[in-house]
Every structure is written in C-alpha cells, then in structure tokens.
Amino acid sequence: MFDKHTHTLIAQRLDQAEKQREQIRAISLDYPEITIEDAYAVQREWVRLKIAEGRTLKGHKIGLTSKAMQASSQISEPDYGALLDDMFFHDGSDIPTDRFIVPRIEVELAFVLAKPLRGPNCTLFDVYNATDYVICLLYTSDAADAK
C-alpha cells in the first residue's frame, strides 16, 4: 500500500482534473501497483479535500452490486463511495452537464445518513443506526481519469 503522501498527490491530481474539466491519464497507468485499499485511501483524501473546500458529506453509495457489473469491472465485490451535498438533485431539476468530463448514469444504492459513521470497524448495527434512509440512486459518475 502507498503512503499517505502518495494518496494525497493522487487525490489532488483528481481534484485538479475535476476543477479544470479535463480528463487525465488513468491513475493505474502511472501507479500499476495500486490496490483497492489504495483507491479507497485516495477516495478518503479526496473527500477530505472537498470538505475542506466547504462541501458536506451527506451519505454513501454502493456500486457494482450485480455479479455482471462486477465481472465487467474485474472486481469480485461491491464497491462504495462518498456522496457530497452538491451531488444531490431533486426530481425534475436540471443537472448542469458542463460540470462533468465524461458523465455516465449508474443505478446504485444510496445510504443517506442522519449521523456520521466513525472508524474502520463500523458494524452493521452502526450503519443501521446512522442511516436516515436508503434509496435507489441514479448516480452520474464522471471519469476524471481515462480508462
């Protein structure tokens, strides 16, 4: 696993790509030894950067829940990600497409939290108690890095 400095550098690279609306070279091409654990560490650092800029963590999503999607992504289990306040759009509202680089629509599960989850050892009951509600999510993912 990479060190925290490397995770921070990668998160900053993705953050800059998002801000400049420019697709960059795939992270895995520059870091072929990157692991799933590294990817989640980069995600945590990216979320930290966004919160420092004033965004709010509102929930989490679970993706790749079907075996077919896992197989197509060469991943053997569902993945998860953060949902920030500016990622929510009300039914019928316009989504500003100019904020995306290469948008794709994905169907995922969203856990909207009533209170934060803490620590790496959260139990099923911790998640249940922190969850305000669970919804089916049409998630607009964006590719800051080329695949």
Enumerate the predicted regions with their spans:
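Single conserved hydrophobic/aromatic residue that forms the stacking wall/gate
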Residues: 139-147
